[in-house]
Amino acid sequence: MTILNEIIEYKKTLLERKYYDKKLEILQDNGNVKRRKLIDSLNYDRTLSVIAEIKSKSPSVPQLPQRDLVQQVKDYQKYGANAISILTDEKYFGGSFERLNQLSKITSLPVLCKDFIIDKIQIDVAKRAGASIILLIVNILSDDQLKELYSYAINHNLEVLVEVHTIRELERAHQINPKIIGVNNRDLKRFETDVLHTNKLLKFKKSNCCYISESGIHTKEDVEKIVDSNIDGLLVGEALMKTNDLSQFLPSLKLKKNLYDS
């Protein structure tokens, strides 16, 4: 069984145990905060938008530096992040909906709930906890599930980041006409990363959609390798959690976009 399959089985177990129902009962409702739309930054900013991630660990990185997460979010906003991503998976990524609930209150930026969503109730919990964006991973959803969950989120005034890794997944994503697609440079089955993977998939980009490069971005040089693919933004976690000079590092990633679309 791959790590991804293991994670999905775990999510199904949580659904059976009414884990998400309990979260809806105990979380403070923070779902109606007015925030700028991520799509506006992606469409109108002349530099790459950065979704800055709060991350404690992952299957590929067992432990990241301990940070004051409240200060980390404030610094992300201070140094130019366009959105905040907060992992809510407890077992594999060390996150929680309580963390999302707490941190979403201290920022006016768009907030992404980063999780493995397979059911509508997870979207309900994400919104209640304070998310304004949810992640849908094409690899773990059927076409019907993808369409249903996407529509459900949009109808609940959430933005959706639709994540793909292969050309086939990109084709499936394009069928629902999303506004934002994320190209994951990490193979979720093997957890191997290649930042140049973005360039391969962006050859098939459509003009009515914005594209974000996710995973494997550790340096300004990594961004320079992919900026000419006409990406609109980046999702960066590990490198931002590790750096001791956030004031210099985060702005250095916001390269000027290649505005000459092919």
From Swiss-Prot:
Keywords per UniProt: Amino-acid biosynthesis, Aromatic amino acid biosynthesis, Decarboxylase, Lyase, Tryptophan biosynthesis
Catalytic function, reaction form: 1-(2-carboxyphenylamino)-1-deoxy-D-ribulose 5-phosphate + H(+) = (1S,2R)-1-C-(indol-3-yl)glycerol 3-phosphate + CO2 + H2O
Biological process (GO), any one: L-tryptophan biosynthetic process
SUPFAM superfamilies, per the entry: Ribulose-phoshate binding barrel
Disulphide bridges: none
Keyword Lyase recorded: yes
Family that this chain belongs to: Belongs to the TrpC family.
Protein name, UniProt field: Indole-3-glycerol phosphate synthase
Native organism: Staphylococcus epidermidis (strain ATCC 12228 / FDA PCI 1200)
Gene it is expressed from: trpC
